[in-house]
Amino acid sequence: MILSHRQIEEIAAAVTKDFNEFFFGKEADEVRIARATPIDQLAKDYLGLNVSFARLSYDGSICGLTAYADTEYIIEEMGSSRTIPLKRNQVLLDESFIKPGQVRQLCGKRRFTLAHECAHQILFQMESDEMKESCEKKYAARTAYSLRDLKSREDWNEWQANVLGAAILMPQKEIDLAMWYFAAGRTLINYEGRFSYKDRFSLSLLCQQLGVSKAAAVIRLRHLGYIEDRPYLEFFDPVEVWA
């Protein structure tokens, strides 16, 4: 199943609307400022996923994975292999997310990884019975893809999970509210990775409010039209003072 960006946005909007009514009740549609998606509750209480932590790779390259049926995950490490049993509807996140001193630092990355795995499970439920059967003994690992890398069906599955995960973690409604509150609805200017002090401050407040990393926020904001990209040569920040 290959979906367009628009279709993925529609799925995310439907899921978050239903979850908000489930989780927040009557408060779901009250006038308010932007709020972070309670992704742990969405995973466990709404989707019924079992979330746990383990060492998933020797170099930290695997952030998380999820299983559609009982299976196993084999890790090759220092010339030997280690097997981790996986149960249906289980999400396994890398143990680095809960190590002392890293919980706060990696909070945004952990939340995005969990949203990514939730997206895999949501997309799996939309597949045909034939496709579900072919996927059931597989696990979906969290990796990063750009459009130019999409060569196989697995690549597309990963890209779609990234996009859907981002839309669930940062729903357009919450982004609109956050940008209105923290940036007065203006477009942020990205000069090849650098922002003016004013835009950088607005971006930082948005990230804190929604519980996401700067990298994830920039990608999402760009997609929703809240970031304009310009060459670094045009960069000018009136707040900066050069000695």
Question: What do these predicted regions represent?
Answer:
Residues 1-243:
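Active-site hotspot residues in diverse enzymes, especially metal/ion-binding acidic/histidine motifs
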